[in-house]
A protein has these predicted regions:
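A solvent-exposed interaction/effector surface
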Residues: 1-154
Length: 154
């Protein structure tokens, strides 16, 4: 796996937010993205060809979270929009990022996150507390799933 530094531009997202324990994130993806896709079905002007699912994590040291993570379950969209129910406009941040492409089952994404975090520490890069995953096109072969892991740098 290759880890590198890139400059990211802001990418608008349609998202649903939830505080969830890390071990439960996988079971919450489908119900939350179903809400986003139902919204996008009613707002087709926001969609664009090749848009991907994104999970965005905002890490906050807040004792009230009780070990739960701030997770935004999202889909890339053309532009910001007015909030409708639980679906709101969000965005991946612009700036310098450390990034790597994970190839393989989603259950192993934690390994790639760990690799990027260790690489950042070993190379003098501080993470800013926001990271995200961009899910590539679906395939039935879990060994060929591609997910881009990004960490905003401080």
């Amino acid at each position: 796996m290759q880890i590198g530094i890139e400059t990211a531009t802001e990418q608008p997202l349609a998202a649903v937010f939830e505080r969830v324990r890390q071990r439960d994130i996988g079971t919450r993806v489908r119900p939350n993205l179903d809400q986003v896709y139902a919204f996008l079905k009613e707002h087709p002007d926001l969609r664009f060809p090749g848009a991907h699912n994104v999970l965005l994590y905002r890490h906050k040291d807040d004792p009230r979270t009780d070990g739960r993570m701030h997770v935004e379950y999202a889909v890339q969209v053309r532009r910001a929009f007015a909030r409708t129910g639980d679906v709101f406009a969000s965005a991946t941040p612009a700036g310098r990022i450390a990034t790597a492409t994970h190839v393989g089952p989603y259950e192993r994404l934690g390994d790639t996150h760990g690799d990027v975090q260790r690489w950042c520490g070993a190379n003098g890069h501080r993470v800013a507390g926001i990271d995200w995953e961009i899910y590539g096109d679906w395939t039935d072969d879990p060994t060929r799933l591609e997910t881009t892991v990004c960490y905003l740098l401080a």
